[in-house]
């Protein structure tokens, strides 16, 4: 996974982002993720492995001491840069299988994914869009990251050889 450019890093550092307040607002005392990374780096430019849901065993109110025979988890990955979804998936499967206790098994379902897409911020159209947005708002527009695996943007890049500028407000 490549590092962000110095230009982008300086843009992010110029934001009035209070990391301590942000972390407090989301219930954390320190960033959860890669050591030595800022919260914005982890939110905007780094890959993730997210456990979106876990189920298994007794789920009603009260206590039960019966050990579940089955459990499930919904897991997703945010890919960035040139990460290959099939390689990430196979690495994850290999890790899980190697970590299984004796006499346990695992099944994987829904094994689809999209390639990450990284846009060239040096493209003149991107700078023109940033300038236009900056004219409409009281502060200069900044480029941020927002994951990297938005499928349609990847298809535009792969099939049409066009970058996509995704604008959020």
Predicted feature descriptions by range:
Residues 45, 52-54, 63, 67-71, ...:
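Zn-dependent metallopeptidase/amidohydrolase metal-coordination segment
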Residues 1-83:
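Midchain, well-structured core segments that form catalytic/ion-binding scaffolds
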Residues 7-17, 116-125, 154-159:
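Short glycine/threonine-rich loop-to-helix capping motif typified by GTGT followed
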């Amino acid at each position: 996974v490549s590092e962000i450019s110095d230009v982008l890093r300086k843009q992010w550092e110029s934001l009035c982002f209070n990391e301590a307040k942000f972390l407090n607002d989301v219930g954390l005392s320190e960033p959860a993720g890669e050591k030595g990374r800022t919260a914005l780096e982890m939110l905007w430019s780094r890959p993730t492995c997210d456990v979106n849901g876990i189920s298994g065993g007794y789920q009603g109110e009260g206590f039960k001491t019966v050990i579940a025979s089955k459990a499930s988890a919904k897991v997703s990955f945010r890919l960035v840069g040139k990460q290959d979804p099939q390689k990430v998936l196979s690495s994850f499967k290999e890790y899980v299988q190697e970590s299984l206790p004796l006499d346990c098994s695992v099944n994987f379902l829904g094994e689809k994914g999209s390639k990450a897409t990284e846009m060239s911020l040096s493209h003149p159209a991107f700078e023109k869009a940033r300038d236009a947005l900056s004219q409409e708002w009281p502060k200069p527009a900044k480029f941020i990251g927002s994951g990297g695996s938005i499928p349609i943007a990847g298809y535009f890049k792969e099939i049409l050889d066009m970058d996509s500028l995704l604008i959020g407000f």
